[in-house]
């Protein structure tokens, strides 16, 4: 087998080299060190496919990612050292719902309705149809696997699938913060093989049942058939969209009609196993070849954990060890998923480091060790008041519902906020409430105090996004979620101001007040304009132009006002699966058109970074800097990679023209995050882009489109 793999690898080598360039591999920030080990990670939404890919007798780790900008399948070779080799890309297609099965010591890889029975030899080149359609009403997850469910020696098909219809997606809290949508559902069932293994004939698909109803977990079931309690029959073990695993004991007297006990949590040391992140993809396999079943689990940020089985006796549950992340020889710098870097000399040693957030809600410091190209340390999680910083939405602080409980979406901006000469951190999150961490240490040894709110001198109650069910405390600044702040002395008075996407999606300036107001911020002022309102005025979370004309008057509704004079938002009409517009109180439908109002002339060219409602809101990240050195501030904002918004205003007016993407690479999934600074110490600022795959893409000026470098 090894010879076959070598031949296949050689045949792919030239293609892979081209594919890597196409997907930005050459722009990923590298550790540039041979002595370093880090967590093994690949892309977004890790789906592990453990198998002996190179035929050397041990299991390698293959990881599939369907997320942008690093889709495809990566091979982490296990050379027996306990540390995996760096990822090698062996497929570049965006494959959702890929799985692995182990049948009679044979590896079969599946996609919905497709089997690759000789994957180790031929990869995805020889698909075979599985004559079994997917279940109706599945969303996101539809996972085919093979197993002998009934013990008759014939291989059956099991399918796990998610159903999001009851959950919906966003904006479903009542005024007390209770989610009024339903839960996610993750169902599992099987199609019995009534033919032979050579010529299978599958019975109609049937859901697995427990003594209390259908097998149902919280989305993303990733089902595994395994004798978990070693009592001689096949049990069912599942993952979930959140952070837990569930097993269902087989209690049916008739193997041809399996019935399971209600689900019980998989436990470690007597407590339910909880993973660090969510969107779990579970594979039950004997990773260490010691004769028992271990668990290999992928999570949203592209990393994979091993939950080792320490052994168990017949009729007992496994003694599981705590989860441990697979490790690899360090190659490319990765910071979770949706990396949101900022560039700063954090430790005062003269070179520029990185402070980044991610979906998991951590803040991480990536130290620059110097050199050109720079060498890097692995990310270190920052602490405040002696505790690791982590924001999480919990059951009701994500507008998209409780399925996002373990996400935090931290987006830091590092600046000297209190004027003491030390870099502090301001931070937005999944919640949208702006906080800051005071640096109480020294220039060489930063030490952060616990988070405290940024204070605004509001004359009345603080505004908030209209879809938030909760109200800010007096003085709080609550803006749209998942947006990056700019901290800059905009009016040149010696005090650091704040620029943010406000609670209605407009870019706003929050001026810093003097000592008589205890250096609070003034309420936001919408002073930022676009050079061409018709083409540049309103965007969505990915930076794309956003327009809708629900009343047919030929004008973009999102640049108008409702009859009551309020801004309008793009939103979903769930009942009819369409987009419409609304203000804070009223949804406007095309079958009942009403005239909208034109805003005052001074507001018609305002830069509205996002015109979306609720889950469509926010997600805009930006840097404000004089990129082209013409004496005017420019904006760099997220887009297909990032866009340069060149400052064109005169006499101090803040006017910007969208020059388009700064690179030809497609880096966006939901959004990207820009940072600007001199990482290699050559005296020239470079562009760094954090992407949804968690990798950081580094662009010295010579690698960018010329028209986005010079005016």
Residue ranges of model-derived segments:
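Sec-dependent signal peptide recognition
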Residues: 2-8
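Short, linear, compositionally biased motifs with a strong N-terminal bias
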Residues: 10-12
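Beta-propeller-forming repeat regions
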Residues: 15-711
